[in-house]
Amino acid sequence: MTYCVGIRLNAGLVFLSDSRTNAGMDQIGTFRKMMVYEKAGDRFMVMLSAGNLSISQSVREILQVEKLDNGDGEPITMWNAKSMFDAVRVLGSAVRRVYGQDGQSLKAAGIDFNCSMIFGGQIKGEAMRMFLVYSAGNFIEATRETCFFQVGESKYGKPILDRVLTPRTPLDEAAKCALVSMDSTLKSNLSVGLPLDLLVYEAGSLQSSQIVCIDEQNPYFQMIHNTWGQRLREVFESIDDPRWDGSSSTHPLMSPLQRHEPVRKITHPGERIV
């Protein structure tokens, strides 16, 4: 499995992905999930992929040459698209092309056609945009109300993103938040693993030099891992324990209920709850 997160902010974009592929306990490999497409000064795009590795790799290859009919005009590719919307349409077409080639064979082998992508960036003359692409090639776009997307093992790392991120979050703070999200996922799920790829894009730059590969020896990620775990324990220990004896407390547990009653006990075979 994998875990990837993409964040769209007023200040720019943040992308983070792991690199573990799990096809069974004896078949764990390292494959990069991040692809960066850059034509400096004209366009900058990033794709993060999750799901079946063979499908994702096929989509990557076809995306480079995929063309959309444009009537009497030049066919649309990811390299000449005038908008990120057109670029993600090209990606969706590449996904559907792979399905047309391999979908029935995979189904006959009992394998689901499973892939999902986060695709974001900026094309000259347009604002930054970010999309979540599904297995059918359809997609949705990030908004001010939903400024991040996740693919893969998303549940472990989502709470910190929900609590911290807003469109006004600074880029470095968002990158830190993404790394905490990844650390939480690594702690709870063996199918996600190092090394990680982290990329930060500043709005309007149409290029990025802030890209790093993070392994087990990375000092900053080690600090994130140790500090986050320690501070969580400190906060947990600072919270009052529940009191069951009804004694005085600032935050009593055994408080009177306005509408509901505690769960009833069944004390003999003939008793019914209702």
Regions found by a protein language model. Give the residues of each.
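Solvent-exposed alpha-helices and their adjacent loops that cap or buttress functional pockets
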Residues: M1, I7-R8, Q27-I28, Y37-G41, ...
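Active-site periphery "cap/insert" segments of enzyme catalytic domains
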Residues: V90-F131
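Conserved mixed alpha/beta catalytic, RNA-binding, or beta-rich assembly cores of soluble enzyme
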Residues: M128-T166, D172, C177-V180
